[in-house]
UniProtKB/Swiss-Prot annotation:
Residues 1-29 form the signal peptide. The keyword Cell wall biogenesis/degradation does not apply. SUPFAM superfamilies: Cupredoxins. One of its GO terms (molecular function) is hydroquinone:oxygen oxidoreductase activity. Keywords: Apoplast, Copper, Glycoprotein, Lignin degradation, Metal-binding, Oxidoreductase, Repeat, Secreted, Signal. It catalyses: 4 hydroquinone + O2 = 4 benzosemiquinone + 2 H2O. Lignin degradation and detoxification of lignin-derived products. Its cofactor is Cu cation. This is Laccase-18. Belongs to the multicopper oxidase family. It comes from Oryza sativa subsp. japonica (Rice). Cu cation 1 binds at residues 87, 491.
């Protein structure tokens, strides 16, 4: 965790959030209450002092630690000069869409100097999620773990001696508000200076003679540790390894997985992976490493991002005879295949009491094929007669089925839907397939040229999709090579989806449906669609409201790789979205929440 100045430390003592659990008697559900004071703080790294945005003086921020069935109450006090929302990433928010915290989708940001209370229940989920700011690029430093423990205190695996959040992130020297402005203007030349592990850059980063501090995890030999690995980064998927040790993957995104042994974890932005690590190595110091991957050229390249920490065994002294073991052998940063194979080996684990929730819908009411890539819009509003192929006459945007989401900064979509006044704000005609089929993964589409120029034209619009309550929805996400060949971590708010299958190349509905896993698929809120490949998911639309769907690469969100799903009310009050709670503050005329 980032070191604080004396003043900041004193500030934390005065206003630090306290978890207040009430009525925890005999395993009954509790109310867990915390306060988040969001403010600016100066931090020095790599010989430069940078202004960052934090919660309660901490980077990463405080952990929200609850038990399944609890009610969570978080009071957010915004001391920033900018608007702010907090999103509870992966929390189902059953009938509490108003508390989802998606800026301009479910609420307008909390105005500077303002406050808001988020109140919601956590039911049917156990494991690791996280929380983060959901406006501009603030989630780079405003984030933290969200842990849900089993109500009966028992895990379907060996109870760990200790559990530890491992929050992988990035260190940005550029002010995050300015970073957002630059990307909105089409400038994507800025990059983070380093990866971080729990806010520490690690000893591979240095300036002059100053070596950056590393995150150190103290362990005892012969015990098991539950590492809750979370990727909060804006730009990159990460490989994570510990020298001399292996992992057993036991959960992801607040759901159990069939135990899977591996020596490396792959975690994309938005994902949370639970792994057991057994400390069965000789007592010593062992490096842990987080390495970002990226597509090879001709895709645009960013500097290699790596952070290194330490596992320190009790009784192991650091001296010339007991130096840390060598770095674990990592994949090449341009090799993205380990990510694909890691995910293909994961399957879901349903406990007896979870069988109903883990039943894959047998029939499909709505089918969507969503292509993910880049495109272009003409400058000046002319959508048909400009030169394509990275021409100065166009602006490059991110697209889903050749629609680039037009983000509003003046109102919240949920309010317009609930009030029955969508006119002039959004339409409900998001396409269920791309405008025309093509070879989605043709490598010749990456450089600008005649092949991709004909596929570039894109609509900049706020086009949503509506589903009736309890409809069974199947989506095939297809990554493309239009101007780039990135993977795409797709996050759906308000839902866990069954990951039926993933594959490379173009999805073939006749051939690839045979690969679907209906028996024990993973349940995930964030699905990594492989580079040059596809992922098929299915879910039951049983949570009414307005739910944001977007790629969790920040530059893809800003460029428009997003939409929202409207799920209609069911036939009863218990299956309908209730009115906004008393603490909910509607949008004002300035695009921020009312005072």
């Amino acid at each position: 965790m980032e070191k604080l100045s004396t003043a900041a430390s004193l500030f934390c003592v005065v206003v630090a959030a306290t978890a207040l659990a009430m009525a925890v008697v005999g395993g009954e559900a509790a109310v867990v209450e915390q306060t988040f004071m969001v403010h600016e703080m100066n931090v020095t790294h790599l010989c430069n002092t940078t202004k960052i945005y934090v919660v309660n003086g901490r980077f990463p921020g405080p952990t929200v630690d609850v038990t399944e069935g609890d009610t969570v109450v978080v009071h957010v006090i915004n001391r920033l000069p900018h608007g702010l929302t907090i999103h509870w990433h992966g929390v189902r928010q059953m009938r509490s869409c108003w508390a989802d915290g998606a800026g301009y989708v479910t609420e307008c940001p909390i105005h500077p100097g303002g406050e808001k209370t988020y109140r919601f229940n956590v039911t049917g989920q156990v494991g690791t999620l996280w929380w983060h700011a959901h406006v501009t690029c603030l989630r780079a430093t405003i984030n933290g773990a969200f842990i849900i423990r089993p109500r009966n205190g028992k895990y379907p695996f060996l109870t760990p001696a200790k559990d530890v959040p491992i929050i992988i992130g990035e260190w940005w020297e550029l002010d995050l508000i300015e970073l957002d402005r630059r990307m909105l203007d089409g400038n994507f030349d800025d990059n983070p200076l380093s990866a971080t592990i729990n806010g520490k850059l690690g000893d591979l980063s240095n300036c002059s003679s100053t070596v950056e501090e590393s995150f150190v995890l103290d362990v005892k030999r012969g015990e098991s540790y539950l590492l809750r690995v979370i990727n909060t980064a804006l730009f990159s998927e990460y490989y994570f390894k510990v020298a001399g040790h292996t992992f057993t993957v036991v959960g992801a995104d607040g759901n159990y997985l069939t135990p899977y042994k591996t020596d490396m974890v792959t975690v994309a932005p938005g994902e949370a992976i639970d792994v057991l690590m057994f400390t069965d190595a000789p007592p010593a110091y062992y490096h842990m490493v987080a390495l970002a991957n990226q597509p090879p050229p001709p895709d645009l390249q960013i500097p290699q991002l790596t952070s290194r920490g330490l596992i320190r065994y009790a009784g192991a002294a650091m001296d010339s005879n007991n130096l840390p073991m060598p770095m674990p052998v990592m994949p090449d940063q341009h090799n993205t295949m380990p990510s694909y194979y890691f995910r293909r080996n994961l399957t879901g684990l349903a406990l007896p009491e979870q069988q109903q929730r883990h039943r894959v819908p047998a029939h499909v009411d709505e089918r969507l094929l969503i292509t993910l890539g880049l495109g272009s819009i003409c400058r000046g509003g002319n959508t048909t007669t400009c030169k394509r192929g990275r021409s100065p006459e166009t602006v490059v945007v991110a697209t889903m089925n050749n629609v680039s989401f037009h983000h509003t900064n003046a109102t919240a979509l949920l309010e317009h839907y609930y009030d029955g006044r969508p006119e002039g704000v959004y339409t409900e005609d998001f396409p269920v397939r791309p405008p025309r089929p093509f070879n989605y993964t043709d490598r010749e589409l990456i450089p600008a040229g005649p092949l991709e120029a004909a596929l570039e034209p894109t609509a900049k619009a706020m086009r949503l999709r509506r589903f009736r309550y309890n409809a069974s929805v199947e989506i095939v996400f297809q990554s493309t090579t239009l101007l780039q060949s990135d993977s795409n971590p797709m996050h759906l708010h308000g839902y866990d989806v069954f990951v039926l299958a993933q594959g490379l190349g173009n999805f073939d509905p006749k051939r690839d449906v045979e690969k679907f896993n209906y028996h024990n698929p993973q349940l995930r809120n964030t699905v990594q669609v492989p580079r040059g490949g596809w992922a098929a998911v299915r879910f039951l639309a049983d949570n009414p409201g307005m739910w944001y769907l977007h790629c969790h690469f920040e530059f893809h969100i800003i460029m428009g790789m997003a939409t929202a799903f409207i799920v209609e009310d069911g036939p009863t009050p218990e299956t309908s979205l209730p009115p906004p709670p008393p603490e909910f503050k509607r949008c004002g005329t300035n695009g921020l929440s009312q005072p």
